C-alpha cells in the first residue's frame, strides 16, 4: 500500500495491541518525516516519538485512547502553524497505514502540561499509533462521511481528476468527525470554505485550522499520484468577499 491507497483505506484505530513496533519501522518513520515538505515554508516543526507500551510513563496525562506509541508534533507558534501541522501529521498517519500500523488523532491532554512545549515550540497535535487489535483499514463506502452533494456547490461539471480530489477531501478525518469544509467547484479549481464559527478575530480556530491541514494533505497526496500540477493559493478577490454562513480558506487550482 502507498500513500495514495492509504487515503482511501485508512480508518482511525482506537484499540491497540501492546506489541513492539520494530526499530526498523520506527527509524523509517523518522526518515519519512525528515524528507517530507510541509504545507507552508518557513514554519519549523519537530517530531518526537513516545513509547508507552508499559503504560507507566511519566509523560502520560489523561488518555481516552491508550496506545503503545504516540507521535508528538511541535511547531513554531506563527500564522498557519496549525494548518501546517495537520498537513504534516496526516502525511505521517497515511505513512503508518502504508506500513501496516493503525493510528488515531488524540487530544493534547494525553501529555502532561510540562511536555506541551519543547523549547520555543508548542505542541500542535498528537497521533496514537501501533499494531491494531482489529482492522486498520476500511472501504471508502464504509466511512462515516457526508456525501459530496452535501459538501459541494458545483458551478461547472467537474473533470474526473477533480472528482478524485474531492473524494480524497471527503474522506479526510476531522475532530469529532465535524467535517467543517465546504467546496465551490469549477472546471479547474476548487474554492475551499469552512463553516462559519463565532470567532471574534474572524480567523479559523486552531482545531479547525488543524482539520484543514489534514484535508489538504489528502488532496495533495492524490494530486501527486495523478501527476496534477496543483497550487494551494489564497485569492485576494475571494478573501475580500463576505460570506454569511462560511469562511474562505484557500483555493485548489490546476496550473495550465
What is the role of each PLM region?
Residues 1-256:
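Acidic, surface-exposed loops and disordered segments
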Amino acid at each position: 500500500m502507498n500513500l495514495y491507497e492509504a487515503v482511501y483505506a485508512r480508518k482511525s484505530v482506537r484499540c491497540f495491541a501492546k506489541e513492539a513496533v520494530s526499530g526498523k519501522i520506527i527509524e523509517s518513520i523518522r526518515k519519512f518525516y525528515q524528507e517530507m515538505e510541509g504545507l507552508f515554508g518557513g514554519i519549523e516543526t519537530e517530531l518526537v516519538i513516545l513509547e508507552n507500551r508499559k503504560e507507566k510513563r511519566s509523560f502520560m496525562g489523561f488518555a481516552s485512547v491508550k496506545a503503545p506509541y504516540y507521535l508528538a508534533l511541535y511547531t513554531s507558534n506563527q500564522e498557519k502553524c496549525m494548518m501546517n501541522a495537520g498537513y504534516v501529521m496526516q502525511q505521517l498517519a497515511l505513512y503508518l497505514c502504508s506500513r501496516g500500523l493503525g493510528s488515531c488523532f488524540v487530544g493534547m491532554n494525553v501529555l502532561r502540561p510540562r511536555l506541551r512545549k519543547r523549547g520555543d515550540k508548542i505542541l500542535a497535535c498528537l497521533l496514537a499509533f501501533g499494531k491494531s487489535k482489529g482492522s486498520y483499514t476500511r472501504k471508502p463506502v464504509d466511512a462515516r462521511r457526508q456525501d459530496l452533494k452535501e459538501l459541494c456547490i458545483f458551478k461547472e461539471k467537474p473533470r474526473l481528476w477533480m472528482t478524485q480530489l474531492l473524494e480524497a477531501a471527503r474522506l479526510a478525518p476531522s475532530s469529532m468527525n465535524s467535517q467543517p469544509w465546504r467546496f465551490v467547484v469549477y472546471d479547474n479549481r476548487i474554492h475551499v470554505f469552512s463553516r462559519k464559527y463565532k470567532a471574534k478575530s474572524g480567523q479559523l480556530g486552531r482545531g479547525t485550522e488543524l482539520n484543514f491541514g489534514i484535508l489538504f494533505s489528502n488532496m495533495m497526496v492524490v494530486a501527486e499520484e495523478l501527476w496534477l500540477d496543483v497550487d494551494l493559493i489564497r485569492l485576494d478577490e475571494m478573501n475580500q468577499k463576505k460570506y454569511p454562513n462560511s469562511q474562505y480558506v484557500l483555493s485548489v487550482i490546476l496550473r495550465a
